[in-house]
Design a protein with these regions (language model features):
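Catalytic core of tubulin tyrosine ligase-like
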Residues: 151, 155, 159-337, 347-350, ...
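Conserved N-proximal alpha/beta basic substrate-recognition cap immediately N-terminal to
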Residues: 6-18, 24-172, 179-185, 191-192
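Polybasic/polar functional segments that serve as interface/processing modules
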Residues: 281-284, 419-432
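Conserved aromatic-histidine-acidic binding/catalytic patches
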Residues: 25-29, 86-90, 215, 305, ...
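A short beta-strand motif that forms the metal-chelation/ATP-contact edge
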Residues: 342-344, 349-357
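A short, surface-exposed helix-loop junction/capping segment
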Residues: 14-22, 78-81, 288-303
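Glycine-rich phosphate/pyrophosphate-binding beta-alpha loops
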Residues: 356-364
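A residue-level signal for conserved active-site and pocket-lining positions in enzyme catalytic cores
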Residues: 41, 98, 142, 208, ...
């Protein structure tokens, strides 16, 4: 980055936490030499070292993190080391485990007699009456295949005109996803892919979810939201929402006809899919800011329902985190930024599609680069003490300036202490 660019970056992104006299005290290591990462580390005057050297801060891939925390590695971190993933992040980011944890969370709340687990009867499009959760119905009905195949067939037959979406559990960026509207299509795929629906025979797990076939459309096109959520602790739960998320649009107008069922440019919003389409626009990258979405909805639907929608999105994020908190390895050296993918239906109800433990830091447009640079800058400001040097003994209570574009979603420690703090508890209290 040249000197002029550095000046612009400084004015755009605000303060640099680390005092000049201490800027060389931090050694960083990374597997992902993305420009938004490297420029943030360099701006702080950090020194790059290798994984076998004495590092303070490691921005690692999920594979490196798993290897580092494995019993075989024998590696033990000291108080001045931090890493950007929790050891078993996959409890949230693997599609099958996320579903399992949310189902367990609901059952536990039911056993406790919690009002959160209240249910009500719902009439399906085909006229069938089913029971659904009132407050925790934020994930489309989902089954893990092959284990839940018989349960899936039972649910499918309740509403045979429904469309379902099939996804491999451990893959991302739209890989291996397809839609079905007939059991015969699923069976045909099983034969051709040589993936039998038998728990002992299948080598790979899939999730199959009821497809949200009534998405909110803008300009006739389907979109989803990518929101960034920073977790600094799971027990007690402490999480922040980045306010500069974005919408990702399909390049082709939405069409529910059977002939378009296999057209992924109609149904999948992933940039990795859409950028190969003939209608992809490399200037805006098929993206719109969440702030512009809010303004659009306030103008077309009204402020009250828009506020309700955004509150509902925060609600589903918090409860998805609460669902996995009991099983997460809560290592004090760790923090993690998750990419939440959410679809809004035409009734303005948000649905959680999936959670990514390694949201892309590749910049596809100028605005993308600005947003992701600021995301990394703000993450570093939140997870590091005021002097900018990693220290796990720090109480992880960043001040308002350090939050940047993050807002506190939940801090269970503050709730438990019942200490009002600059209005923060008021924002948290609904998640008790």
């Amino acid at each position: 980055m040249n000197q002029e660019a550095k000046k612009i970056a400084t004015s755009l992104y605000g303060r640099v936490n680390v005092p000049a006299v201490e800027r060389c005290r931090v050694n960083f290591c990374t597997d992902l030499e993305k420009s938004v990462l490297m420029s943030n580390f360099e701006r702080r005057g950090w020194n790059q070292v290798g994984p076998d050297d004495e590092w303070n801060f490691y921005w690692a891939s999920t594979q490196t993190c798993r290897s580092l925390f494995s019993v075989e590695s024998g590696y033990r971190m000291n108080d001045n080391q931090m890493i950007n993933h929790f050891p078993n992040h996959y409890e949230l980011s693997r599609k099958d485990l996320l579903v399992k944890n949310i189902k367990r969370y609901r059952k536990e709340l039911e056993r406790e007699g919690s009002l959160l687990a209240e249910k009500a009867e719902v009439v399906l499009p085909g006229g069938q009456v089913v029971t659904r959760y009132i407050h925790l119905d934020f994930v489309p009905i989902t089954f893990v295949l092959p284990a839940d195949y018989n349960m899936f067939v039972e649910e499918y037959r309740k509403s045979p005109q429904s469309t379902w979406i099939m996804k491999p559990c451990g893959k991302s960026q739209g890989t291996g996803i397809f839609l079905i509207n007939k059991l015969s299509k699923l069976k045909k795929w099983s034969r051709e892919a040589k993936t039998p629906f038998h728990p002992q025979l299948s080598k790979e797990s899939y999730v199959i979810s009821r497809y949200i076939d009534n998405p909110l459309l803008i300009g006739g096109k389907k979109f989803d939201l990518r929101l960034y959520v920073l977790v600094t602790s799971f027990r007690p739960l402490k999480a922040y929402l980045f306010q500069l998320g974005f919408c990702r649009f399909c390049t082709v107008k939405y069409d529910t006809s059977v002939t378009e069922l296999d057209n992924m440019y109609v149904h999948l919003t992933n940039v990795s899919v859409q950028k190969h389409g003939g209608d992809y626009n490399s200037i805006h990258g098929g993206k719109m800011s969440v702030e512009n979405l809010r303004l659009y909805l306030e103008g077309t639907r009204g402020r009250a329902v828009t506020e309700k929608l955004f509150a509902a999105m925060q609600w589903l994020i918090v409860h998805s985190l609460k669902a996995v908190a009991p099983v997460m390895a809560n290592d004090r050296h760790c923090f993690e930024c998750y990419g939440y993918d959410i679809i809004i239906d035409n009734q303005l109800k948000p649905w959680l599609v999936e959670v990514n433990a390694s949201p892309s830091l590749t910049s596809t447009t100028v605005n993308d680069r600005i947003l992701k640079y600021k995301l990394i800058d703000n993450i570093l400001s939140v997870v590091l003490p005021p002097d900018g040097v990693p220290d796990v003994r720090w109480n992880k209570l960043p001040n308002a300036e350090a939050l940047g574009s993050f807002e506190l979603l939940i801090d269970e420690e503050l709730l438990e202490k019942d200490e009002p703090s600059s209005g923060v508890r008021g924002r948290n209290s609904k998640y008790k």
